[in-house]
């Protein structure tokens, strides 16, 4: 058996991502861009660790530091889950986690659940719109310490696909080698839950403080969990 976990609004609060992580990346970006040579060109003279992340941006935003910064601000404000943005954010967050400026405040019941799953001989997998490197940082530098030994693998929109499409969950099932009915998915997003169900997974909606309010119909159509205490996979 296995459990597949979303992150934002499921194992940690939405406010951590929107109020801590996103602003941190925006604050650090201008100084980082000062060390880059614009326009950014593939195979150019840039040699910094940041350059490969910037090369993934659309051409029109690589002409100047201001254009790129404005684009990042726009995507962040609109919460657009573009893979190239997520990769850049993960790169910037890495220094914050490693310096101790950032520590992911995971819900204690989520941490306990992950430990129970693994102690029971089962597996934990992560599926988030945040990049896989960013996911590893979040669990590696959490309020409960380094939880990466508990996690068997990580999935994002690059290696699995969009979270609201059933095909993405089928891709994950093939990668982890489990039948659909042997995997429990937990997420705060009802559309993700619906997509997972279409792929045959069992799926519960996480209802956490600060999450989007569920409609009466959504509550009727889904299993709702306000805590992971007592959840058995």
Swiss-Prot record:
Cofactor note: Binds 1 Mg(2+) ion per subunit.
Localization in the cell: Cytoplasm; Nucleus
GO cellular component, one term: nucleus
Enzyme class: hydrolase
Pathway entry: Amino-acid biosynthesis; L-methionine biosynthesis via salvage pathway; L-methionine from S-methyl-5-thio-alpha-D-ribose 1-phosphate: step 3/6; Amino-acid biosynthesis; L-methionine biosynthesis via salvage pathway; L-methionine from S-methyl-5-thio-alpha-D-ribose 1-phosphate: step 4/6
Keyword annotations of the record: Amino-acid biosynthesis, Cytoplasm, Hydrolase, Magnesium, Metal-binding, Methionine biosynthesis, Nucleus
GO molecular function terms noted in the UniProt entry: acireductone synthase activity; magnesium ion binding
Catalytic activity, reaction form: 5-methylsulfanyl-2,3-dioxopentyl phosphate + H2O = 1,2-dihydroxy-5-(methylsulfanyl)pent-1-en-3-one + phosphate
Enzyme Commission number: 3.1.3.77
GO biological process: L-methionine salvage from methylthioadenosine
Binding-site list for Mg(2+): 6, 8, 188
Entry superkingdom: Eukaryota
Annotated InterPro entries: Enolase-ppase_E1, ENOPH1_eukaryotes, HAD-like_sf, HAD-SF_hydro_IA, HAD_sf
Annotated substrate binding sites: 128-129, 163
Keyword Zinc-finger: no
Family to which the UniProt record says this protein belongs: Belongs to the HAD-like hydrolase superfamily. MasA/MtnC family.
Assembly, per entry: Monomer.
Functional summary from the UniProt entry: Bifunctional enzyme that catalyzes the enolization of 2,3-diketo-5-methylthiopentyl-1-phosphate (DK-MTP-1-P) into the intermediate 2-hydroxy-3-keto-5-methylthiopentenyl-1-phosphate (HK-MTPenyl-1-P), which is then dephosphorylated to form the acireductone 1,2-dihydroxy-3-keto-5-methylthiopentene (DHK-MTPene).
The protein's name in its UniProt record: Enolase-phosphatase E1
């Amino acid at each position: 058996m296995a459990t597949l976990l979303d992150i934002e609004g499921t194992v940690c609060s939405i406010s951590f991502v929107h109020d801590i992580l996103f602003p941190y990346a925006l604050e650090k970006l201008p100084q980082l861009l000062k060390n880059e040579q614009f326009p950014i060109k593939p195979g150019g003279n840039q040699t910094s660790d940041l350059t490969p992340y910037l090369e993934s941006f659309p051409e029109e935003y690589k002409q100047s530091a201001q254009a790129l910064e404005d684009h990042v601000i726009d995507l962040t404000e609109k919460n657009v889950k573009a893979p190239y943005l997520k990769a850049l954010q993960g790169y910037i967050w890495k220094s914050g986690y490693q310096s101790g400026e950032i520590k992911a405040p995971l819900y204690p019941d989520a941490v306990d659940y992950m430990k129970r799953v693994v102690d029971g001989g089962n597996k934990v997998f992560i599926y988030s719109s945040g990049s896989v490197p960013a996911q590893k940082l979040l669990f590696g530098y959490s309020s409960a310490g380094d939880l990466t030994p508990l996690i068997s693998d990580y999935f994002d929109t690059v290696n699995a696909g969009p979270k609201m499409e059933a095909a993405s969950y089928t891709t994950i099932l093939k990668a982890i080698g489990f039948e659909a009915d042997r995997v429990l998915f937990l997420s705060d997003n009802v559309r993700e839950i619906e997509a997972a169900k279409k792929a045959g997974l069992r799926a519960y909606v996480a209802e956490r403080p600060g999450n989007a309010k569920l409609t009466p119909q959504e509550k009727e159509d889904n299993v709702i969990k306000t805590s992971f205490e007592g959840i058995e996979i």
